[in-house]
C-alpha cells in the first residue's frame, strides 16, 4: 500500500496545511507505511527547501512531471567533483565558495553557480548559468540531470524534464499568458490533461489511498474524481465547511457536489466530524465513512525552566484579517486597565502588521503590547502564563495544541472547532460565548473580563490541565490514531504493521 497526498502547494504563502502534511509524513513513516507527497507543479529551490525544513524527505516526494521520464530517484547524488569534471572546471575557475554555493567565473564574463544540498553533503541540488550576472538557465540534479529551466527577464518561460540519458521526455512552454505542454510528439493544451496522464502513470492499486488536502480550483481534482483505478479516495478537511448561517464554504462546493465519489472523509476534530455528518445528511450523502485524525502532533511536552513571568500572554499566527488579532489587542488593552502589569506579545508575520501596529499606537498600548515577528516558538511558549486567541474559527489550531503542550492557560471564543477542542471551560482556560451576530464590543468586553478572571485565579491547576489535555497529541498517540484508522478503512492489516 502507498498513501499519496495531493498536493504540496507551490506559489502560495506557507500555511497550516503544510505543517499538517509534514506531521502526516512523520506519522506514516513511524508506521512503516509507504507515502508519497505530490508536487503537481515544479517547486522553486526555496519552496522545496521549505518543505524539507518541515520534515519531509527527498525520497517521499513525488514530482508529477518526472513520472513521464525514466528517472529512478530525485535524491541529490551528483557530487561537486563529478560535476566539475563534466563541466571541465578547475579550482582556478572558483571565485567564491560558501557552505551553500560555489561560483565559477570564466574569461568571457559568464559564470556557473553550483548550489549545494544541505541534507546531502557535497552534493549539488541545482546549477545556475549566469550571463552578465543574469540567470539564463538552471539545471536540477538527482543521480543525473532531472530538469532544465530557461529564464527570460527573471522568469521561467520553458522547462524540460529529462530521461537519464539527458533526452527530453516532457516539456512546458509559456506562450503569452498560458502554458503549453509537450509529451512525446503530443501537445497538451491544459494542465488538467497533464494530471490525467500522470495518474495513469501511477498504476494505482486497490490497497492504495489518495488523500486530497484541497480540491477547489485544483487541476488534479477532476482527474482524481474520474479515475478508473480501484484505489481509495479521501478528502481531508482543513477549513470550516459549513458556516453558522448554513452556507457552504465555496472551497468545498466541488467536494459536496461530487461527495459520493469519495470513499472517506477526514476531519481534524471530533466536533467537525459531527457537523460534517449533519451537512452530508442534508446533501443526501449519508453513509460515507468519516474519520477524525489530528493534523498535528507534539514531540514532547515542554516544561517551563523557571517561574513564568507574571501577567504574560502571547498569541501566534499569520497576521491575517481572518485571525482577528485586532480584537486580541483591544481585549488586552481593556484588561490592562485592571491589570497594569499585563504584557501581550504577538508572534507572526503577515499583511496585517502595519494595521495592527497603528491600532496599538491608537490605543496607546506600546508599552504592553508588542509585535514580535516570526520566531521558533518551542522554547518561547513556556515563558508565558497564558495564550489568547481571537480567531473566529479554527478547524484544528496548531498553535493552541502547542501552547497546551507548554502548559499555558488558554482563552478564546467558543467557536468551531479548535477552541472547544483545546480549551476546556474552567479547567485549562475560559471560553467566551460566540456568535457571528454578536457585537464586537460585547465579545471584547467578555473576553477581557475572562482574562482578568484568569489572572485573579491560581494558575497552577490551569497549567496542569493543559499538560494533561496535550498528552493526547503526543506523536505516539497520534500515530496510533492513524494506525487504527487505516486498519478500520481496510487499507492496513495487522500483519503490515
Model-flagged regions — what are they?
Residues 392:
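Aromatic "clamp/platform" in nucleotide-sugar-dependent glycosyltransferases that forms part
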Residues 355-374:
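Nucleotide-activated donor-binding/catalytic signature segment of Leloir-type glycosyltransferases, i.e.
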Residues 318-337, 351-354:
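A conserved mid-protein helix/loop that constitutes part of the nucleotide-sugar donor-binding site
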Residues 409-413:
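Short hydrophobic beta-strand element within catalytic cores of glycosyltransferases
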Residues 258-287:
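A short, active-site helix/loop in glycosyltransferases that binds the activated sugar's phosphate group
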